[in-house]
């Protein structure tokens, strides 16, 4: 049975509050045989103090050996089996920036990329251009590709190297089962999109035509001169998060994909002031709305971005920046405070990985364990053991006294 259907009849409304902090891609690896991970290297006195008062463990977001994308990783943390509830990155990003998807449309996540001779990929993120440069390039593509063979094409800025394309159905629905253009490595050319079923053949044609026309339109660009696609999606549908858990839930995040996912499961997405991933703005939003909700999903992105860039020192710094503001979160006195990642992004690999992520749960009803720091190694000593991602929400609900007894 789907764990959601087990939890749903047990959930009850209470006044207790849950704060789930997701440090995106927080899990790491040592750079050397006898070295430390980014978490272990970081100076985190506040996380250490919290860990000494909490329960720790490790979480596999999908299954052993499976490297999660951000979408499946978050769905798992929210209690949705990522093998059952599948959604492409395109829909998450589109919804996150306020784009309405209609039945039959397909949204796809795009990366601006740097291409060299023979179309070989030099940089999958085109040097992470500024948001202003992103908007400039999107405007150029909009002028060059308003439609393809009668299919309307909409192009939207997201942030840095990220953008979203929506192919609008004009009759027959477009299929979303298409292979990625993005090979997720450098030194090779973009892949040709291939349909995996007849309904997706037109979508694959549209994608390949877009790639060709985009490269022509960007031929005068020195760095942002190619596009990569992944994460095709039509309109997804999920059981409502608030109804499952009897919560009023809010999302505090900066990046569109995470706001989109939260919106799709039914959370309210709160406005955040300041620069993207500005932690001060997120703290302010949490304080402002603290009395309006009983569940908060609070997201930190840069622990992932720095890992993807292969920048060990920068990832350590982002962890330390979060640690510095942790006392402000604790001062709100949530009944349950959870700190976890949606996947690991070791700087050593410069990509997501299959390694379990540390899980911390602090509540007045938790049993203390032997873990003394919030690190991968210390989490192995924790009383929570190795858990599936879908176990996290039931554990938080139980620690908040929001679950009734199961059975007689």
UniProtKB/Swiss-Prot annotation:
It is an enzyme of class 5 (isomerase). Pathway: Carbohydrate degradation; glycolysis; pyruvate from D-glyceraldehyde 3-phosphate: step 3/5. Keywords: Glycolysis, Isomerase. It catalyses: (2R)-2-phosphoglycerate = (2R)-3-phosphoglycerate. Its EC number is 5.4.2.12. The keyword Transmembrane helix does not apply. The keyword Nucleus does not apply. InterPro entries: Alkaline_phosphatase_core_sf, ApgAM_prokaryotes, Metalloenzyme, Pglycerate_mutase_ApgM. One of its GO terms (biological process) is glycolytic process. Belongs to the BPG-independent phosphoglycerate mutase family. A-PGAM subfamily. Catalyzes the interconversion of 2-phosphoglycerate and 3-phosphoglycerate. NCBIfam families: apgM, PRK04135.1. This is Probable 2,3-bisphosphoglycerate-independent phosphoglycerate mutase. It comes from Deinococcus geothermalis (strain DSM 11300 / CIP 105573 / AG-3a). The gene is apgM.
